[in-house]
Structure formats: structure tokens, C-alpha cells
């Protein structure tokens, strides 16, 4: 079993934390991945890339996990956390998605004139 990142107390504090708490406790691998595919982008919108990455790493299904890690890497590049963006891209298992993540990071940096 994986670690829980949202406590019951946190879940009582706001709706997104409650949703994440419930999603962390879904036992079906497919159900867990589907729930996190909705929740992680909401944490990204708030700029909470660390929690988004931790929640994504819990996903057992590699393709779903890799797709979310790609989104998080791109968000890190937008936030100028380039080292973390590269680290997340490197953590992607599927070679094609890893290359796509690196491309997205590079596109963000190029658009900002930082390459």
C-alpha cells in the first residue's frame, strides 16, 4: 500500500482535498487512475506541483501516471522550476511520452525566450 498524502483533517478543510483523500483510497487501479486524472490537474492549476507529482506517482497504471507526469513537468517549466521539470520528464517510463514531455518543456522555455 502506498503512503497517503491527504489526511482526514485536510480532507475536512476543502473540497479538493476531500476529493483527493477519497481518490487515494480507491482500491481499483483503473478507478484510482481515473480519479487522479481529474484531481491532479486541479492541483496543477493551483501551482501545487509537489503534491500533484506525489499523487501521480501513486498511480499503478504506467500510461496514466506518465501522462500526468508530463503535464506536471510542463507546469514546472512554466513556473521556471527547470530542474524539477527535467527530473519529472526523466521519471516517465514510456520512451515516447518521455520524449514528448521533454519537447513540451523545451517549447515552454522557447516561448519564454529562455533557450
What do the PLM-derived regions correspond to, one by one?
Residues 1-115:
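Non-catalytic tandem-repeat scaffold regions and their flanking low-complexity/translocation tails
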